[in-house]
């Protein structure tokens, strides 16, 4: 829970790891780099909001805590692509492993940032740069923009459905499901 009061308005700069690409993410510096990137966005906001009327409370909050929220999307897409049932023990163990990886790597990055650039006021004595590092937010729009992967850690609500958009009705077929159906020769327009 982010702090908010008469004195401060909270901010949290968000991004999500696309878990449809977990096999590439797990052995890379992606989470570390994403955490550094989000902290850089905090600094960019701090720099650009200086003297802007109406942003004083949120700017002060960002200066003192540098809250970021690195989350995830595409978990169900990864499971589908790899033939792992969503409600299986294997999926549960994998989700725990992924969440731990994101938590550990974002903490490692926050500690590195604190050593390199210092701890903000609300983190003094803790050896970290960010009061918050992870946030598993809904990612409906982002997931759609990333090729129609599943939202956050959630399963797709349906496998084939029509969706209203600014350009009209769109037929939505999750990419991993679409590939599996083509593979099995059971998909048709």
Regions found by a protein language model. Give the residues of each.
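Long, C-terminal-biased catalytic regions of enzyme "large/alpha" subunits
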Residues: 1-189
